[in-house]
Amino acid sequence: MGPVMLDVASYELDAEEREILKHPLVGGLILFSRNFHDAEQLRELVRQIRAASHERLVVAVDQEGGRVQRFRDGFTRLPAAQYFAAINDAATAAQLAQEAGWLMAAEMMAMDIDISFAPVLDIGHVSAAIGERSFHSDPQQARIMAECFIRGMHSAGMKTTGKHFPGHGAVTADSHKETPHDNRPLAEIRTHDMVIFRELIQRKLLDAIMPAHVIYTEADARPASGSAYWLQEILRQELGFEGIIFSDDLSMEGAAIMGSYAERGQASLDAGCDMILVCNNRQGAVSVLDNLSPIKADQLTRLYHSGQFDRQTLMASSRWQQANKALTALSERWDAHKQTLGQ
């Protein structure tokens, strides 16, 4: 298995994509909204992906909830992470967050999708890229909700990915469009943003971590996604993280400072990433495959899902029906609240 995760263009594979998926450096594929028409089509696309590759790929998606939910029609409308903080009763909020993690994971695994890149562990809501994707502005409250969501995912059989290390929540710039700079003192980042990562790593609840395309100017001139300081010295050595490290999408503008696509990919792997994402640019992806040194990343097999869910049986279960009803209601209440605020 190779260290590169790619994407595909539409509802089914074309001939070029079938050949690319056989490349020895390819180890994963991420799905987007453009790959989804309905549940039956999606399941068939995943079957095609499995059949095209020589080895079982890690199939992934961003199915967080709120505005970042790639599959909608026929799937539960998942609330964004911030919504759980609006529930007045802490026990109810914790239970519903856990059910959200379970339900999201179960619905994805019924499609034979291995992982959803979740949960978001960024603190606060000021970032344009993060906003309501964050559980809370208080690190401990965010950790409590994230841990519940994680336990739900694990109970279903899906591995977790905490993002975006060491924290994207305090920068207003969107790393999809530019390279954000976080100029805060390193001590503040350590005692505020990194707390949630540290505590969840200590509890061995994070199977993978995705670093931010953010430059933390007090620490390094490179984005964290391409920084050996953040990935090796801090994440591996200081925090003792033993799981998988993903890059975020190297086609994002926040990664452009690292050079060409091939240079971005090599820099991220050299810095300590186990798998790099190259999406939304076929030419860039091919350049990475053509120029990367041969490398195996067999540790990525740890990310395969271990749950078995039949979609019809899942949706007929009382647990799914109750969770679906509660989560949909929470999303609708939050939408009504935002409308009163003119958002």
Curated annotation (Swiss-Prot):
Top-level taxonomic group: Bacteria
Subcellular location: Cytoplasm
Principal location class: cytoplasm
GO cellular component: cytosol
UniProt GO BP: carbohydrate metabolic process; cell division; cell wall organization; peptidoglycan biosynthetic process; peptidoglycan turnover; regulation of cell shape
Chain residues that bind substrate: 62, 70, 133, 163-164
Recorded metabolic or biological pathway in which this protein acts: Cell wall biogenesis; peptidoglycan recycling
InterPro entries: Beta_hexosaminidase_bac, Glyco_hydro_3_AS, Glyco_hydro_3_N, Glyco_hydro_3_N_sf, Glycoside_hydrolase_SF, NagZ_Beta-hexosaminidase
A Pfam family per the record: Glyco_hydro_3
Active site: 176, 248
Disulfide bonds: none
This protein's UniProt keywords: Cell cycle, Cell division, Cell shape, Cell wall biogenesis/degradation, Cytoplasm, Glycosidase, Hydrolase, Peptidoglycan synthesis
The protein's role, per its UniProt record: Plays a role in peptidoglycan recycling by cleaving the terminal beta-1,4-linked N-acetylglucosamine (GlcNAc) from peptide-linked peptidoglycan fragments, giving rise to free GlcNAc, anhydro-N-acetylmuramic acid and anhydro-N-acetylmuramic acid-linked peptides.
Family: Belongs to the glycosyl hydrolase 3 family. NagZ subfamily.
Protein name: Beta-hexosaminidase
Protein encoded by which gene: nagZ
